[in-house]
Amino acid sequence: MAAKIIDGKTIAQQVRLEVAEKVKARVAAGKRAPGLAVVLVGANPASQIYVGSKRKACEEVGFVSRSYDLPETTSEAELLALIDELNADAAIDGILVQLPLPAGIDNVKVLERIAPDKDVDGFHPYNVGRLCQRAPRLRPCTPRGIVTLLERYNIDTYGLNAVVIGASNIVGRPMSMELLLAGCTTTVTHRFTKNLRQHVENADLLIVAVGKPGFIPGEWIKEGAIVIDVGINRLENGKVVGDVVFEEAAKRASYITPVPGGVGPMTVATLIQNTLQACVEYHDGEEA
């Protein structure tokens, strides 16, 4: 069986067009365009690329995009003061602080300082807690983007054995909550998991997010499984690959996401969706 490719690039483009239409309709009705503030501290090259793609996506859909590029020497107090300022700014619906932050700045403190109704990354404990309690508002971008992919391909997740590999706060943990909401029997594996292969072989839906190229061999994949590869790994030869050995896995899976062009574009598309949602659900009616 050759797997059907889940085309994240195309779905992400659809999502962006849908958001752009809604923004156009808002502006035509005399409402303001949603605003996103993107904060980058230091000059991490990978972060600069991510931030660039987020800003570009914002402008494409007609958002107001505000950039704050702070020097590596920025103190925690200065960053927290900027967040306070943005929390109070009625023209801003979403605040995104690009991780990782330089040494000496406490990630947790920074993420918790963002007002939950402007936390378009979905990392604030309030938003994670809402997801845990089955009443999500702003949802973490990568997991929500994956759910959107499954929905757009009309994949029925109810009753599937879902296995998440990797238990990070950004993907693995919130993903497990999304899968419970989607009716899956969900297992999360991590570095202490014994007999990983057995878990993978049992997965009807496999989501891999560990950041290690070729970490999951193709022969472990159950026949007919749905494989979602979150990994983005650049090899020394410049090639970008996922956490799953794609060629082998694609022979066994029913659906698979490629790398690049699978989950990656959905993360940014979901950020855009979240910003519009924050604007409409939380901030409409406030004077900008």
Swiss-Prot record:
<comment type="similarity">
    <text>Belongs to the tetrahydrofolate dehydrogenase/cyclohydrolase family.</text>
</comment>
<keyword id="KW-0378">Hydrolase</keyword>
<dbReference type="GO" id="GO:0006164">
    <property type="term" value="P:purine nucleotide biosynthetic process"/>
</dbReference>
<keyword id="KW-0028">Amino-acid biosynthesis</keyword>
<dbReference type="Pfam" id="PF00763">
    <property type="entry name" value="THF_DHG_CYH"/>
</dbReference>
<keyword id="KW-0511">Multifunctional enzyme</keyword>
<dbReference type="GO" id="GO:0005829">
    <property type="term" value="C:cytosol"/>
</dbReference>
<dbReference type="InterPro" id="IPR036291">
    <property type="entry name" value="NAD(P)-bd_dom_sf"/>
</dbReference>
<keyword id="KW-0658">Purine biosynthesis</keyword>
<dbReference type="InterPro" id="IPR020631">
    <property type="entry name" value="THF_DH/CycHdrlase_NAD-bd_dom"/>
</dbReference>
<keyword id="KW-0486">Methionine biosynthesis</keyword>
<dbReference type="InterPro" id="IPR020867">
    <property type="entry name" value="THF_DH/CycHdrlase_CS"/>
</dbReference>
<comment type="function">
    <text>Catalyzes the oxidation of 5,10-methylenetetrahydrofolate to 5,10-methenyltetrahydrofolate and then the hydrolysis of 5,10-methenyltetrahydrofolate to 10-formyltetrahydrofolate.</text>
</comment>
<dbReference type="GO" id="GO:0004488">
    <property type="term" value="F:methylenetetrahydrofolate dehydrogenase (NADP+) activity"/>
</dbReference>
<dbReference type="GO" id="GO:0004477">
    <property type="term" value="F:methenyltetrahydrofolate cyclohydrolase activity"/>
</dbReference>
<feature type="binding site">
    <location>
        <begin position="166"/>
        <end position="168"/>
    </location>
    <ligand>
        <name>NADP(+)</name>
    </ligand>
</feature>
<dbReference type="Pfam" id="PF02882">
    <property type="entry name" value="THF_DHG_CYH_C"/>
</dbReference>
<dbReference type="InterPro" id="IPR020630">
    <property type="entry name" value="THF_DH/CycHdrlase_cat_dom"/>
</dbReference>
<keyword id="KW-0560">Oxidoreductase</keyword>
<dbReference type="GO" id="GO:0035999">
    <property type="term" value="P:tetrahydrofolate interconversion"/>
</dbReference>
<dbReference type="InterPro" id="IPR000672">
    <property type="entry name" value="THF_DH/CycHdrlase"/>
</dbReference>
<comment type="pathway">
    <text>One-carbon metabolism; tetrahydrofolate interconversion.</text>
</comment>
<comment type="subunit">
    <text>Homodimer.</text>
</comment>
<keyword id="KW-0368">Histidine biosynthesis</keyword>
<keyword id="KW-0521">NADP</keyword>
<keyword id="KW-0554">One-carbon metabolism</keyword>
<dbReference type="GO" id="GO:0009086">
    <property type="term" value="P:methionine biosynthetic process"/>
</dbReference>
<dbReference type="GO" id="GO:0000105">
    <property type="term" value="P:L-histidine biosynthetic process"/>
</dbReference>
<dbReference type="InterPro" id="IPR046346">
    <property type="entry name" value="Aminoacid_DH-like_N_sf"/>
</dbReference>
<protein>
    <recommendedName>
        <fullName>Bifunctional protein FolD</fullName>
        <ecNumber>1.5.1.5</ecNumber>
        <ecNumber>3.5.4.9</ecNumber>
    </recommendedName>
</protein>
<feature type="binding site">
    <location>
        <position position="232"/>
    </location>
    <ligand>
        <name>NADP(+)</name>
    </ligand>
</feature>
